[in-house]
A protein has these predicted regions:
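All-alpha effector-binding/dimerization core of bacterial HTH-type transcriptional repressors
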Residues: 17-170
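N-terminal helix-turn-helix
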Residues: 1-15
Length: 170
C-alpha cells in the first residue's frame, strides 16, 4: 500500500508507523478459512478475565470509566502450528461466554446460541515486535516482527460486538 514503506538514503527501507484501515468483511473467521484450505483448525484458550478496556475500546463499547469488559485470549493453530494469538474484548452483556467452550469458532457460537452475527466494523494492520510471552506462544523470538491486526466489530443490530487484537505468525 502506498505510504507503507519509508526509504531513508544511506539507511534503508523501513515500515512506516501509519496504520491502514480496512472495512470489516462480514467475519469469515479463522475456522472457516482453515476449512477452505484443508487445514485442521484448533484452539487453545489461554486466559479469560474481566479487564478495564483501553480508552478506544471504552468509547467503542460506550462504557463508563472503570467499567470492565470480558477478555478472551486464545492461540489459534492450523495443523497444530501456531497461526494467530488473538485477544478479544466483549462487553459484559456477553459475560456468559465464560461458561461456554471457547475452543470453537466464536462466530459460529455467537450465531447458533446467541443469534448474533458480526456484520460491520473496521480493522487496521500494522507491524509489531512481539513480547517474550507472545514470542513463546508463536514459537518465535522476543522482538521478532509480526503482523498485528486490530478489529472493531458490530453486530446485525449495529451494536458493538467485540474488539480484537490478533498477532499473525509469518
Amino acid at each position: 500500500k502506498e505510504g507503507s514503506l519509508t526509504k531513508i538514503q544511506g539507511k534503508g527501507t523501513f515500515i512506516s508507523r501509519n496504520k491502514t484501515v480496512y472495512p470489516f468483511d462480514h467475519g469469515q473467521g479463522f475456522t472457516y478459512s482453515c476449512q477452505l484450505r484443508g487445514v485442521v483448525p484448533s484452539t487453545r484458550v489461554l486466559n479469560l478475565d474481566y479487564v478495564i478496556p483501553t480508552e478506544e475500546d471504552r468509547l467503542f463499547f460506550q462504557l463508563k470509566e472503570k467499567e470492565k469488559v470480558l477478555m478472551i485470549q486464545r492461540l489459534r493453530l492450523g495443523d497444530d502450528k501456531p497461526c494467530i494469538l488473538e485477544t478479544l474484548f466483549f462487553p459484559m452483556t456477553f459475560s456468559s461466554l465464560c461458561e461456554e467452550s471457547l475452543d470453537v469458532s466464536l462466530y459460529s457460537l455467537l450465531k447458533e446460541k446467541y443469534h448474533i452475527q458480526p456484520v460491520k466494523g473496521h480493522k487496521w494492520i500494522e507491524i509489531c515486535k512481539v513480547t517474550p510471552f507472545e514470542a513463546q506462544m508463536m514459537q518465535a523470538q522476543p522482538g521478532d516482527a509480526m503482523l498485528l491486526m486490530h478489529e472493531m466489530v458490530t453486530d446485525q443490530f449495529k451494536k458493538p460486538l467485540h474488539t480484537s487484537k490478533m498477532i499473525f505468525s509469518p
